[in-house]
Design a protein with these regions (language model features):
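N-terminal amphipathic alpha-helix/helix-capping segment at the start of soluble metabolic enzymes
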Residues: 2-13, 162-163, 171-194
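Conserved, mostly hydrophobic/aromatic
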Residues: 40, 49, 140-142, 153, ...
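N-terminal glycine-rich anion-binding loops that anchor highly charged ligand groups
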Residues: 37-60
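Metal- or metallocofactor-binding catalytic centers and their adjacent structured scaffolds
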Residues: 52-158, 162-163
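A generic structural motif
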Residues: 46, 62, 241-243
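Metal-dependent enolase-superfamily TIM-barrel catalytic cores that perform enediolate-based chemistry
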Residues: 175-245
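Glycine- and acidic
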Residues: 25, 125-129, 234-239
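Short, Gly/Pro- and small/polar-rich lid/capping loops
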Residues: 1-43
Length: 245
């Protein structure tokens, strides 16, 4: 059932911001030293004519969202950027009002066709992975939720209850979730402290003996230096998978 708090998308714009890494990262057998941020701005309008603009951003992430030995990283990166632009353009043409959950859920119907069009246009072998589609669309999703929260002057996570959502989770999942809403699965107040996970790539130097080139920026380089500097307690370790000794 429609809600007075529903919004429609007035405008959606996608841009790409190049980012160079301080040090190369080895992930999934590939070495990357740069990427792009997919930045999306979305302006929404309420039934009463109020406007707000939200923002969402996500690294392209093709190195993990589209693991393949058939295509180069440059090609999968280009395809994901293409997908992001197309989906954002489609979103800007959606005429109806709704809650961000249903607006974005309806948009997912365009994902498969858009992905097939891109694969054919770039003359790729194989399919455009669903994970890569979701990652490429994620900054749009974040921007729509952000704009919705801003136009109602609330935390967007607090807009996931029956007071704002038009449908319960059974519409998106199955009957087991009848009568349930996303606010039941999210916190109402932010945690004061959360552990920071430090990513350790397969090329990251563990000791001074592993350092090939030390940047002249006074920041830590070895894992031990990072632990001492930031008081790390949680590590996310990426293995190269080619050394079992």
């Amino acid at each position: 059932m429609p809600n007075d708090t529903d919004v429609r998308i007035l405008d959606a714009v996608c841009s790409f911001e190049p980012v160079s890494f301080r040090a190369p990262l080895k992930f999934g057998g590939r070495i990357v030293d740069k990427t792009f941020l997919m930045n999306v701005e979305v302006t929404v309008e309420t039934h009463s004519g109020n406007h707000a603009t939200g923002f969402g951003s996500m690294p392209v992430g093709n190195i993990w969202a589209w693991p393949t030995s058939e295509l180069t990283g440059d090609k999968t990166e280009l395809a994901m950027k293409d997908f992001a632009e197309r989906i954002v353009n489609i979103a800007s043409q959606v005429p109806h009002y709704g809650h961000p959950m249903e607006l974005m859920f309806d948009l997912t119907e365009e994902y498969a066709h858009t992905a097939k069009t891109i694969v054919a246009g770039h003359n790729f072998d194989g399919e455009f992975p669903k994970l890569a589609q979701l990652v490429a669309a994620s900054p749009l999703d974040a921007a729509v939720h952000d704009a919705y929260g801003r136009v109602h002057d609330i935390n967007s996570y607090d807009a996931l209850s029956s007071d704002f959502m038009n449908d319960d989770l059974s519409d998106y999942l199955d009957d087991q979730f009848a009568g349930e809403y996303l606010d039941q699965y999210t916190l109402r107040t932010p945690k004061e402290r959360m552990p920071l996970y430090h990513l350790v790539g397969a090329l990251d130097p563990l000791t001074d003996a592993d350092v090939v080139d030390r940047p002249n920026d006074r920041l830590p380089v070895t894992l031990g230096e990072w632990i001492n500097a930031d008081g790390l307690t949680h590590l996310k370790i990426k293995l190269s998978g080619d050394n079992f000794d």
